Amino acid sequence: MAAFTCTSRPPISLRSETRIVSSSPSASSLSSRRMFAVLPESSGLRIRLSLSPASLTSIHQPRVSRLRRAVVCEAQETTTDIQVVNDSTWDSLVLKATGPVVVDFWAPWCGPCKMIDPLVNDLAQHYTGKIKFYKLNTDESPNTPGQYGVRSIPTIMIFVGGEKKDTIIGAVPKTTLTSSLDKFLP
């Protein structure tokens, strides 16, 4: 499995600004206080800010706000356990394979492909030694999907002895994938 690490940018800087709402002497005690946070640039990280209970004091009391920050890494973990197949390796890896072969037709921009990716990875681990799993990027290898009539992705095809036996289109539940794969176990 690939390991991802997250790094954060320089810390957040805070500025406070006080403005007088009214210029009349009787209302001079009314002021508006604003907190500005200058956030660092972020690439794939979300910075969550939350106020501490001490900052939720009454409006009439002087406020001291303490800011607590947490950086959360939301990089989707991907695995490299599933071998990649392309137009040039298709015949040797899929058509000439002994036993059942599952090919996941996907693209990096496809949202449903990203949704089903963890399921396919789990199934590849579960069926290790029984079924071979491959991934084919339809953007990088457009000939093979065209040859097999792949019109939408994600599409999962099951091959046995070089022949297409089953096709599953779309992001389906794990139970649907499992029931389709179980039919082709040796």
UniProtKB/Swiss-Prot annotation:
| Entry GO CC | chloroplast; chloroplast stroma; chloroplast thylakoid membrane; cytosol; thylakoid
- Compartments where found: Plastid, Chloroplast stroma
Q: Where is the active site?
A: C110 (nucleophile), C113 (nucleophile)
Pfam families given for it?
Answer: Thioredoxin (PF00085)
> Known Gene3D superfamilies for this protein?
Glutaredoxin (3.40.30.10)
Q: Which GO terms describe its molecular function?
A: enzyme activator activity; protein-disulfide reductase activity
* Any one GO BP annotation for this protein: positive regulation of catalytic activity
Q: Which InterPro entries does the record associate with it?
A: Thioredoxin, Thioredoxin-like_sf, Thioredoxin_CS, Thioredoxin_domain
Plastid: present as a keyword of the record? yes
Q: Give UniProt keywords alphabetically.
A: Chloroplast, Disulfide bond, Electron transport, Plastid, Redox-active center, Transit peptide, Transport
How this chain assembles, per its entry, is: Interacts with G6PD1 and G6PD4. Interacts with PGL3.
Function summary:
Thiol-disulfide oxidoreductase that may participate in various redox reactions. May activate NADP-malate dehydrogenase.
Per its record, how is this protein called by name? Thioredoxin M2, chloroplastic
* Species per Swiss-Prot/TrEMBL record: Arabidopsis thaliana
Lineage, opening ranks: Eukaryota, Viridiplantae, Streptophyta, Embryophyta, Tracheophyta
